[in-house]
């Protein structure tokens, strides 16, 4: 059994859930979407790595159906959610931006719900078109989606996340450009936009988006290249041909697959944990995070009889957090 897989998965689940309370209060749809998808994928992977530790038996076919589709949806959801963030940043920093009224806010909310929730569901549904068989089970890793690699698969599975990532980088570049051009009065610009953003939070969101999308783009290209190298593009003969053996479940034991296969899979598997750590690094040490931690410790102090010790502890923690102010100036 690989104990590192469930440990990493559940640890990353906890990390991405830490910023949830203040983002929930802010009703930031795009950021909540990232938290949801990272949390769900990390958690289900942790379960998979326990259930299928050293095994490839098809214990839970319905569970695998669900988790395999969630992976497909997440591949679209990560870049589409980040696109929503960068699009909003580019809008609020633009010199042509007007203060949003109730109608504008509703349109933005509907757009973000479509991009963050509806679009991934569409991706999961479309995946059935190129789903050659039900799913794969990999020893230690568990359920994995399968794709009939063809021209149709390029346009349904591989290219959309790449295109979304590139569009996100364009929006991030526009947002960064407006910051550079208007940096002298940028805090006033953000205040006048009624966005609730500070300069530090604005830069942190841009940095997060660029980092995650560069990483996601590189990973997507890597997966696409090795998939084409290993399998090439298979001909799309007909719907019946592609789905002729749809109920099949392929099981991959460690001893039956070459080592390079497992090395490549582990490399791509690590994309979600790394993305989770990046997300926490940007959101777990900001001003709003420190305020939330202070609030938590204040509530905890009320239940501790030794107030002097609690006050001293809180003061030390406060001093320690102050060294993370670089994004909030």
Specify the residue positions occupied by each region the protein language model found.
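Membrane-proximal first intracellular loop
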Residues: 1-116
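Juxtamembrane membrane-interface segments at transmembrane-helix boundaries in membrane proteins
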Residues: 1-8, 57-70, 103-105, 139-157, ...
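Cytoplasm-facing ends of alpha-helical transmembrane segments in multi-pass membrane proteins
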Residues: 14-21, 46, 72-99, 112-131, ...
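Class A (rhodopsin-like) GPCR intracellular loop-transmembrane helix junctions
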Residues: 27-36, 64-69, 101-121, 150-159, ...
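Membrane-helix interface motif
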Residues: 50-55, 128-141, 179, 224-238
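Intrinsically disordered, low-complexity terminal tails of fungal membrane proteins
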Residues: 106, 181-203, 285-329
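Extracellular-loop-to-transmembrane junctions of the mid-late helices
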Residues: 130, 138-179, 199-226
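Intracellular effector-coupling site of seven-transmembrane GPCRs
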Residues: 186-224, 240-266
